[in-house]
């Protein structure tokens, strides 16, 4: 048996909390201006029509409507489609 504690054990034992990234609103889901659609590191998903891009690459809705995800030329894009008023 060892008479001393393992060398690195006192320097271990910490972990950072998860950053809560990912898609926050699904395809076809209703959003209002300011709703966060995607939280991400870098532009894994690119902004399309009627969405804004924050300085931390958060994609958010600029208008009221429904979320639409699509792929163009190997780029994932998110749009917000305006709901036709009746």
UniProtKB/Swiss-Prot annotation:
Transmembrane segments: none annotated. GO terms for molecular function: structural constituent of ribosome. The keyword Ribosomal protein applies. GO terms for biological process: translation. It holds the Pfam family Ribosomal_L27. Belongs to the bacterial ribosomal protein bL27 family. PROSITE patterns: RIBOSOMAL_L27. This is Large ribosomal subunit protein bL27. Residues 1-22 are annotated as: Disordered. Keywords: Ribonucleoprotein, Ribosomal protein. GO terms for cellular component: ribonucleoprotein complex; ribosome. The keyword DNA damage does not apply.
